[in-house]
Structures are given as structure tokens and as C-alpha cells.
């Protein structure tokens, strides 16, 4: 009879999950014993990087990725990254070793309350009742992670379970998509067909459901302006399309003003709505009807206004497109192109983003963790292909550096660029070592404004004055740090050096880091 370990690896092969992201400890060694030659183990030097790489890999493959962490301390180190995966709705199977069942009652060293620790930010958290249940629980975790709304699932596995005997699992498959109610889709189509001035808001659920281009067809049929929802972790509409109007602001008053004048607003794969600072105002103007489609029932339930339907966003979009008649409506005017920023030293963030955009490959995937520079990034860099833009939907830091490495390992032929702030880059800097070790040729561009400028902007917005400590970050040699972890790079301080340096980073054929020193301007939030 096979061991639990052998049965589990057979299961993972069948699921196509042969890459394991991990940082091993004593409670994980029994799982890694006799590691199969057809599997790949990707080592991260800290668990936040492990989980971030796994999330990027899952976003690249479209399937749940497997991460293996070291009991309670390792899971604790990874919880910030788990929160990001939860908000991004990225499917992950996260496992951790638990102490040996045979003396758990004595609470030996490394015994942990793992199931409870993971629970707030996973779709499910399990520990098998019996050793022979381990393969079935991992299969359950995989299908739970993949079922909409997708997300991370945690399994705690006692270290002595792996050598126990287990019966082979019976054949079992799950269809993970759930269609929205067809009557609701017909009703929505009728309302949209009669609308005088409809608008569309797209969110990450559009991209997750593979409907990036389908959303374009729907918007064109409606001749409706399209906005990206606030703080979206994925781009969901081609941003060079004439119907695209930009990103909605994450504040009630300003968002409602942006959507004013539209009698119907169709929100696809996004909350209604995601805000950040409290700015009182209506959700939308009183005359505006909101139609909401999301794969997440909680997202639909907490919406403040409108009519919601739960189901696969891509299926809903295709259903609406088929039902809607063509309209004779003048499309809205396209956005004005941004002004070309001036070349100067110190460089402005606008100039840096404009220069990156001028040489960025059309099929590049960009991982953005710029915080204070995000508005300028969206002004100059447009994403018109699926999988082109990734950021954290949780608002925390530390995802994009390891996320870009994991994505590159999943999609090795696609150019990957990580644009990251100086403060952000230090949260999961260990990912640079993994990039070098596994040949993930990501171009890392560190925007160095020598501080937490986004917090300075928030400080100014709330009138906190100038005596707020902890907002300056100086004295870090980012190129030196990268070289110490095996990644070459260079410092860029002069505007004339920027373009050739970016070209070198993009064409290096290996991971490469640019530290770009910019004017430490403080952004004006919600201006």
C-alpha cells in the first residue's frame, strides 16, 4: 500500500500541481523526504516571500498553487501575504507541518494552533482527523480554493502522517464555474437596453473569469464609458480603448461625482465600491440605478445600493452581450493623452513612468507596488492585454516583488517588470535571492523617493502636521542589497541615464534591479 506521501504526490500530479513553494523546517522534512524528480521545489528565504511567489505563480497559471510553510512561526510570518491573497481572490493551497500526533497532548516545541491562526483569511482551514485523510483533505483544499470566489485554503498536517499508509483516492473532478441566474441576466439586459446613459465599472473579477476581451465587446455594444474600479488588484479592460475613462477614486463623494449623469451603472467583478479615506457622500446620485455582478456573495450582500446577482462574471458578460440589442448612441469622448513630462534632475515620477512606458514590451506583465506613484503609473502606462497589471488588493506591502518572481516562473516567455517603491521593496526583499537562484529574469525598478511619501500625503490630507515620526527612509543602498542577494543592478540619478538603463534591465536575460532616484514630491490625495 502507498504511503500518505506517495498518495499525495500522485494527487498533485493529477492536478498539475508539481511546483511547491516553501521554506522548510523540521515539521516539513517528512513531506519533503524522497522528493519526486518530476516536481520542482522553489525555496523562499522568508515565508512572506514564499506565499507571495505562490500567489504570483497562481495568477500566471490560473490554477491553485501549493505553498508549504513551517508550522506556527512560518504561518505567522506569511499571514500578511495570506491577507493579500484573500483580498486578491487568488487560489492557493497552503500547508504547514504540525507536531507529531503521538505527543501532541504534551504540547512539545513547535506545537501550534495553526487551524485557528489561519482562519480569518482563508476559505477553509483543516487538519485531517486521521493520517490517511491527508490526500483527501489536500484535494478538498484545492477544489475549495478554485471554487468561486477563489482564495487561499489552509491544511495543517502532523509530521508523522506522511509515512502512514493510505488507500489511493477515487477519481473525482469538480467544475468550478457557477452561472448567474438567467432571469436576472435577462432583467439586467432589459434595463441596460432602455438606459439613456449607461456606464460600466469593471473589476478584477472580469480578469479572473477570463472575460477581459468580452468586457470590451459588451461596452462597445452599449457605447458606454468604462471605468476601472478603485484599487483593483488586476486590470480588467484595455486601457488604450477609446471607451476607457480611467480609474475611479476610492472615496464616496468623488466617486459619485465621477459617475454622475449616468442613469444606469453596471458594476462587473468589483465591489460597490471599495473606498479608502472617509469622505462622506452618496454611493451614487439618487437617480442612478446600479446593477451589480460578482462571483462573491459577500461582496454582493454588503453593497450599499443597487441590484446584485451572484455568479461567474464572464458568463454574465457573455449573456448580457448576446441579449442586448445594438444601440444608436454617440460614444463618449476618449481621454486626452497625458502631457509629456519634462526631463530634469531630480527626475519627476511622471518622467520615470513616461520613460518606462516608452520602451515597455506590449505583452509585459507589470507588478506595481508604488503607493505614492500609482496615479502617475496609471497616467502613463496603459495595460491592454490580460494579465498585464498586478498589485495588492489588500493595501499592504510585500506582494509585488515575490509575486513578480512567481509569475515569471509560471509564464517564462512573458516579460515581467516589478515597479516598486523604496519602502515597499524592503518588505519581501528576500525574493531577489529566489529570482537569482531560479533564473526569473524580472526587471525590478525601485522608485526611490527616500520615504513613505504616500503616508506624507495622507498626513497632509488629514491635517496631522509635520511632526509625524517614521516617514523618512534614507541610507539604503538598494543596488548593494540586490547584489548581496545575487541580482545585478545600477543606480540611476540623472534623467539622461534613465532610458538606456531601463533598456539594459529589460534585455538583461537575468533578474536586474534599477534604483531610480526621484524628486521626493508628496502626492496630493484625492486632488
Feature map (PLM): residue ranges:
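N-terminal alpha/beta PP-like core and its mobile active-site loop of ThDP/TPP-dependent enzymes
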Residues: 1-324, 359-362, 441-444, 461-464, ...
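Active-site diphosphate/adenylate-binding microenvironment
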Residues: 3-18, 23-26, 31-33, 333-411
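Phosphate/pyrophosphate-binding active-site segments
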Residues: 4, 132, 168-170, 287-370, ...
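Short, small-residue-rich loop/turn micro-motifs
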Residues: 24-25, 96, 159, 230, ...
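N-terminal cationic-hydrophobic initiation segments that often serve targeting/anchoring roles
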Residues: 58, 145, 219, 357, ...
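Thiamine diphosphate
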Residues: 95, 104-110, 250, 256, ...
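Bateman (tandem CBS) regulatory domains
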Residues: 121, 336, 485-486
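Conserved short loop/turn motifs at secondary-structure junctions
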Residues: 203-208, 340-341, 421-423
Amino acid at each position: 500500500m502507498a504511503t500518505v506521501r506517495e498518495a499525495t504526490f500522485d494527487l498533485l500530479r493529477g492536478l498539475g500541481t508539481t511546483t511547491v513553494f516553501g521554506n522548510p523546517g523540521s515539521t516539513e522534512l517528512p513531506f519533503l523526504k524522497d522528493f519526486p524528480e518530476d516536481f520542482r521545489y522553489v525555496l523562499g528565504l522568508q515565508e512572506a516571500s514564499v506565499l507571495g511567489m505562490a500567489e504570483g505563480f497562481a495568477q500566471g497559471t490560473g490554477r491553485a498553487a501549493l505553498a508549504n510553510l513551517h508550522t506556527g512561526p512560518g504561518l505567522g510570518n506569511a499571514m500578511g501575504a495570506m491577507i493579500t491573497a484573500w483580498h486578491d481572490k487568488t487560489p492557493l493551497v497552503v500547508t504547514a507541518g504540525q507536531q507529531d500526533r503521538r505527543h501532541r497532548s504534551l504540547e512539545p516545541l513547535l506545537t501550534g494552533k495553526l487551524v485557528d491562526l489561519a482562519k480569518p483569511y482563508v476559505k477553509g482551514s483543516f487538519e485531517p482527523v486521521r493520517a490517511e485523510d491527508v490526500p483527501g483533505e489536500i484535494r478538498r483544499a484545492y477544489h475549495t480554493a478554485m471554487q468561486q470566489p477563489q482564495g487561499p485554503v489552509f491544511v495543517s498536517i502532523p509530521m508523522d502522517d506522511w509515512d502512514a499508509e493510505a488507500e489511493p483516492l477515487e477519481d473525482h473532478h469538480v467544475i468550478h464555474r457557477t452561472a448567474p441566474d438567467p432571469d436576472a441576466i435577462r432583467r439586467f439586459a432589459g434595463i441596460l437596453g432602455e438606459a439613456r446613459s449607461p456606464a460600466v465599472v469593471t473589476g478584477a473579477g472580469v480578469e479572473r473569469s477570463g472575460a477581459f476581451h468580452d468586457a470590451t465587446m459588451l461596452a462597445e455594444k452599449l457605447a458606454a464609458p468604462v471605468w476601472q474600479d478603485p484599487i483593483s488588484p488586476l486590470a480588467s479592460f484595455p486601457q488604450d480603448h477609446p471607451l476607457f475613462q480611467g480609474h475611479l477614486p476610492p472615496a464616496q463623494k468623488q466617486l459619485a461625482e465621477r459617475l454622475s449623469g449616468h442613469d444606469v451603472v453596471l458594476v462587473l467583478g468589483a465591489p460597490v465600491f471599495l473606498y479608502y479615506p472617509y469622505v462622506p457622500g452618496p454611493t451614487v446620485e439618487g437617480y442612478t440605478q446600479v446593477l451589480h455582478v460578482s462571483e462573491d456573495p459577500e461582496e454582493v450582500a454588503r453593497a450599499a445600493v443597487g441590484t446584485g446577482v451572484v455568479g461567474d462574471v464572464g458568463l454574465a458578460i457573455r449573456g448580457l452581450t448576446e441579449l442586448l440589442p445594438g444601440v444608436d448612441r454617440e460614444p463618449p469622448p476618449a481621454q486626452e493623452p497625458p502631457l509629456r513630462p519634462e526631463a530634469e534632475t531630480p527626475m519627476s515620477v511622471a518622467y520615470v513612468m513616461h520613460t518606462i512606458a516608452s520602451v515597455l514590451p506590449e505583452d509585459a506583465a507589470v507588478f506595481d507596488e508604488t503607493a505614492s506613484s500609482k496615479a502617475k503609473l496609471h497616467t502613463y502606462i496603459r495595460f491592454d492585454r490580460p494579465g498585464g497589471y498586478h498589485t495588492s488588493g489588500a493595501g499592504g506591502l510585500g506582494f509585488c516583488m515575490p509575486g513578480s518572481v512567481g509569475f515569471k516562473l509560471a509564464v517564462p516567455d512573458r516579460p515581467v517588470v516589478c515597479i516598486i517603491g523604496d519602502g515597499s521593496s524592503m518588505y519581501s526583499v528576500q525574493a531577489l535571492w529566489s529570482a537569482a537562484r531560479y533564473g526569473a529574469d524580472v526587471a525590478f525598478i525601485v522608485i526611490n523617493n527616500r520615504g513613505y511619501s504616500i503616508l506624507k500625503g495622507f498626513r497632509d490630507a488629514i491635517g496631522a502636521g509635520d511632526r509625524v515620526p517614521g516617514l523618512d527612509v534614507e541610507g539604503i543602498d538598494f543596488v548593494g542589497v540586490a547584489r548581496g542577494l545575487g541580482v545585478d543592478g545600477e543606480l540611476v540619478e540623472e534623467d539622461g541615464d534613465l532610458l538606456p538603463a531601463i533598456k539594459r534591465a529589460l534585455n538583461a536575460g537575468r533578474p536586474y534591479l534599477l534604483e531610480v532616484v526621484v524628486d521626493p514630491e508628496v502626492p496630493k490625495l484625492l486632488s
